[in-house]
Amino acid sequence: GMSAISRKNNLGRNLLRMRKIFPKEFKFFPDTWILPTDMSDFKAQFNGKRNKTFIIKPDNGCQGRGIFLTRDFKEVPIDFSGGTLVAQRYMAKPFLLDGFKFDLRLYVLVTGCDPLRIFLHKEGLVRLATQPYVPPTQKNLEKQMMHLTNYAFNSKNPDFEENVNPEDASDGHKRSLTAVLDFLKDEGHDVKQLMEEIEDMIVKTLIAVQPSLSHVYHSCQPDDMSNSMAFEILGF
C-alpha cells in the first residue's frame, strides 16, 4: 500500500514513470536513478569535465542515516545486499533562509484512495541546517550539517538553536511554516503561489501511486463502497 510512497525507491520509480508519460507536469523533482537498476545510465552522468554533484540515499533509510554526497562514481557502493539506493542530482543553488539550507515538513491526511481524498494541514515545520551554506566542492561534501536538513543529527550540533518561545516560532533551527511564510511575504515573495505549487506537487505525487493504493485497498476491503475504512497521515 503506502510503501509505494514511503519507500524512496518505490516513490522514485512511480514518479519517473509518470514523468515519462507527462514530462511537463512531473518536472518538479530532480533527475533520479534507482540503483542498481539504473547503474549504467547513472555512471554515464560522471562523464565529461563538469564537476556534477549527486546525493545518494538508502531506499529505506530515515533521519539522514546513510546519506552522502559524491562527485566520484568510484564512491558509489557496488554491494546492494542491504537494499537499493536512490541517487539524485544535487541542487547546488538552493533557496536559503538566513544563509542556511532548509526543508519543509508538511502533514497530509489521506482518507480515501478511490477516488483520492486528501487534506493538507495548514501548519507545518521548517527544518534548517546548522552550518551556513556554500556551494558543494570536493572539500566540503562531507559537511552533512551544511548540506542536509535532517533534525536527527543537526540537533546534535552545539550550534543548534532551539525555539524556546511558544509565542514566537520564527527563530531557531526548527520553525513553524506560518512564521516562515510570513517572513517570505514580508520579503516580497508570493507565498500564495508558492503554496499552490506545493499543493500541486503533493496531489501529483499521490496520483502517481493511486492505482497501487486502490488495488491494495480493494483487495483488503472488496465490499466497501464508502471509501472511508482506512486513513493515513503522511509527512511530505
Question: Where on the chain are the PLM-derived regions?
Answer:
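Conserved N-proximal alpha/beta basic substrate-recognition cap immediately N-terminal to
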Residues: 1-53, 60-62, 72-78
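Catalytic core of tubulin tyrosine ligase-like
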Residues: 41, 45, 49-236
